[in-house]
UniProtKB/Swiss-Prot annotation:
Identification of the protein by name: Maturase K
Any matching Pfam family: Intron_maturas2
UniProt family annotation: Belongs to the intron maturase 2 family. MatK subfamily.
Source organism (scientific name): Alpinia zerumbet
Gene Ontology terms: cellular component: chloroplast
Keyword Transcription regulation part of the UniProt annotation: no
Primary location: plastid
Keywords for this protein: Chloroplast, mRNA processing, Plastid, RNA-binding, tRNA processing
One Gene Ontology MF term: RNA binding
Length: 515
């Protein structure tokens, strides 16, 4: 218990007490909408986060002037409630001001965490490039480690039961009471207007208007969750700082936990003390995986440990159904857009010893990764590229564009999805997806010119093929120019993992959420 409290005091020693006055500075809102801190390693471009990049210095100055008025926010909310059907102009100003205020608040509360991460990286002399890892880098790790494990726990991280829990977590880091009261006000009002939280969804489902604030709150929550999970392990302390300090929900990390012992938790309940030399932990968004080489009884103790942490630290009711433990040899788990499983491959080897020969059956383990075709088709259907059954259709909203723009858009989507799913063990699902997008492109062009899709396929066959040519096929065609046609007809089965994927395509991300 004393060791855990020491860790908490060490990491929370740099609390900020005077953040609220920064809300009255105009440059804070410039940072929020222009990402003036772009030179640091914490931020992605705005188009990656979904911002519409709308900013008005006049409205920001007007907001700052009005905030100097006593109880301005309370009067504004009451006025909106009284004139909800007639005060459209007042509602617009309140919604716009509250959105700007939430973005500025998110920038301010990120400052202590950003400074802490920079100092930790400088102390450890860690290059910044190591902080941004590709999501595909997880799969070679799985190929190397999962083959030697016995059990796997599929964990769905519960979202906070009440927003006040998030405020209490932030209070342990920031001692500025005014900022905390402002956060409570924003959460309360946005919750009433159903603009901050989407009902019946996990917390990582953000609204478009408050994505930055929700990113911060969600990562703060994950910060505490992962700290309670791996605090006795020295190897995890560096990864903990990275995963929470970056404050953007594209972060995922994996770590091997050696000899992890569970001591005493805040509820003063003593758990079993156990050690496991082979524990692996991986997380993306609200889903995490815990693998072990131990026994099923050991995994049950892990489940007991996590459920009680949730119950006593985050004030949840007992939720054991969120942890599903299976034997790895009989289990297929879904993670990062792939269905993965460990398959046993049998091969017969003939051995010759003097005049005697005999056959030996050799078993080898291999990680099999496949694309979930049904959820992927469902995702394409929601984007209006095909029907629910996978039948390609035209996209009427794009018929006003030029032909080259239509082809480029379809080709870009196809290349991005193929780029991400290039690690599939079997390519049939990938080829079916490319076929849907290619035929949908032809039908969109045919609808624009009031012609048939067949005529456009015949007229633009070479152009469409080149536009839908994936990157890995281009590389293969350069390395093996004489065997290109052999690979393009579906016989190429090698998996390719890319180390430059730091953001998942929107269609793929919707697939991860809906599955």
């Amino acid at each position: 218990m004393e060791e855990l409290q020491g860790y908490l005091e060490e990491y929370r020693s740099r609390q900020q007490q005077f953040l609220y006055p920064l809300l009255f500075q105009e440059y804070i809102y410039v940072f929020a909408y222009d990402h003036g801190l772009n030179s640091s390693i914490f931020y992605e471009p705005q188009n990656s986060l979904g911002y519409d990049n709308k900013f008005s210095s006049v409205l920001v100055k007007r907001l700052i002037i009005r905030m100097y008025q006593k109880n301005y926010l309370i009067y504004s909310v009451n006025d909106i409630y009284q004139n909800i059907f007639v005060g459209h102009n007042n509602y617009f100003y309140f919604h716009f001001f509250s959105q700007i205020l939430s973005e500025g608040f998110a920038v301010i509360v990120e400052i202590p965490f950003s400074l802490q991460l920079i100092s930790s990286l400088e102390e450890k002399e860690i290059p910044k490039s190591h902080n941004l890892q590709s999501s595909h880098s997880i799969f070679p790790f799985l190929e190397d480690k999962l083959l030697h494990l016995n059990y796997l726990s599929d964990i769905l991280i519960p979202y906070p039961a009440h927003m006040e829990i998030l405020v209490q977590m932030l209070q342990s880091w920031i001692q500025d009471a005014l900022s905390l009261h402002l956060l409570q006000f924003l959460l309360h009002e946005y919750y009433n207007w159903n603009s901050l939280i989407i009902p019946n969804k996990s917390i990582y489902v953000f609204s478009k208007d408050n994505k930055r604030l929700f990113c911060f709150l969600y990562n703060l929550y994950i910060y505490e969750y992962e700290f309670l999970l791996v605090f006795p392990c020295k190897q995890s302390s560096f990864l903990r700082l990275i995963s929470s300090g970056v404050l953007l929900e594209r972060i995922h990390f994996y770590v091997k936990i050696e000899h992890l012992g569970v001591c005493r938790i805040f509820c003063q309940k003593t758990l079993w003390i156990f050690k496991d030399p082979f524990i692996h932990y991986i997380r993306y968004q609200g889903k995490s995986i815990l693998g072990s080489r131990g026994t099923h009884f050991l995994m049950k103790k892990w489940k007991y440990h996590l459920v009680h942490f949730w119950q006593y630290y985050f004030h949840f009711w007992s939720q054991p159904y969120r942890i599903d433990t299976k034997k790895l040899s009989n289990y297929s788990f879904y993670f990062l857009g792939y269905f993965s499983s460990v398959q046993m491959n049998s091969s017969m080897v003939r051995n010759q010893m003097l005049e005697n020969s005999f056959l030996m059956d050799t078993l080898t383990k291999k990680l099999d990764t496949r694309i979930p075709i049904i959820p992927l088709i469902r995702s394409l259907s929601k984007a209006q590229f095909c029907t629910v059954s996978g039948y390609p259709i035209s996209k009427p909203i794009w018929t006003d564009l030029a032909d080259c723009d239509i082809i480029n858009r379809f080709g870009r989507i196809c290349r991005k999805l193929s780029h991400y799913h290039s690690g599939s063990s079997k390519k049939q699902s990938l080829y079916r997806m490319k076929y849907i997008l290619r035929l949908s492109c032809a039908r969109t062009l045919a609808r624009k010119h009031k012609s048939s899709a067949r005529s456009f396929l015949q007229r633009l066959s070479s152009g469409l093929l080149e536009e839908f040519f994936t990157e890995e096929e281009q590389v293969i065609s350069l390395i093996f120019p004489k065997r290109t046609s052999f690979y393009l007809y579906g016989s190429y089965r090698e998996r390719i993992w890319y180390l430059d994927i730091i953001r998942i395509n929107d269609l793929v991300n919707s697939l991860l959420v809906t599955t």
